[in-house]
Amino acid sequence: MSKLGNRADWADDEEFDDPSALPAQQVTTNKDGTKTVVSYRFNDDGKKVKVTRRIKTTVVREHVNPQVAERRSWAKFGLEKGHAAGPSFDTTSVGENIVFRPSVNWKAQAAEAEKDGGEKGSMKDQLKDKKVKCRICSGEHFTARCPFKDTMAPVDEAGAEGAGEDAPAAGAVGTGTGSYVPPHLRKGAAGGGERMAGKYEKDDLATLRVTNVSELAEEGELRDLFERFGRVTRVFLARDRETQRAKGFAFISFADRTDAARACDKMDGFGYRHLILRVEFAKRAS
């Protein structure tokens, strides 16, 4: 009987496959320093899924003031004694830095700030639906930050440049009189204050305005379409801030005006994403 009592039960040696059991997680260290983690889980359909992840550990070193680093290494005392380093969220509230400037008449300043805050709040409610619109390319950015402000004129100023050339300037110096006119103010001469070769530099820039562009268009696709005719220096595709989709127009800048003219001739009327492109030279800034 003693031998039978010492023997293990035969049922303990039998292995049963539990369908609900998952294999243990496996972690393998690779030669390049990364780790491969293999785990298992059940998906929404109840099937067992194997998940393999490759993890790379990156160490970020931060250089701080030695005195600040020394204070961080101090041992906590009082009610915080024995707690881990760093702020404890149950006793410490971390907020943004507030600059305190003491003043003698702080009550009057507080009342004035409260009054101004109410006016600003109402103005903010009035302008919350307003959007910034560029006067040059109609994009959602300020006109001063437009990438084409030096090469194009505003969209609404159609024909302004030609009208300015035909109409004589009002009050021109020496018009109809026999008085002496300086060379830089004579007809056909460069305007005062114009930098050397500024007019010719603008003539060398060749920028095309492409309209009727699909909202699914990408800058890389437009670059590939127009680079067949010459070197493209810049591609600007106007996008909506909220949806990040194209707004229907783009600007293509070429290094050579001849290439731009050939691209304008070939791509005007070209079918792209079920739409017919309209290509023309962008108006230069006056």
UniProtKB/Swiss-Prot annotation:
A GO term from the CC aspect: eukaryotic translation initiation factor 3 complex, eIF3m
N-terminal signal peptide: none
Compartments in which it is found: Cytoplasm
Gene3D superfamilies in alphabetical order: 3.30.70.330
Annotated stretches, region: Disordered: 1-34
Assigned keywords, A-Z: Cytoplasm, Initiation factor, Protein biosynthesis, RNA-binding
GO molecular function: RNA binding; translation initiation factor activity
Subunit structure, as described in the record: Component of the eukaryotic translation initiation factor 3 (eIF-3) complex.
Record-stated family: Belongs to the eIF-3 subunit G family.
Protein name: Eukaryotic translation initiation factor 3 subunit G
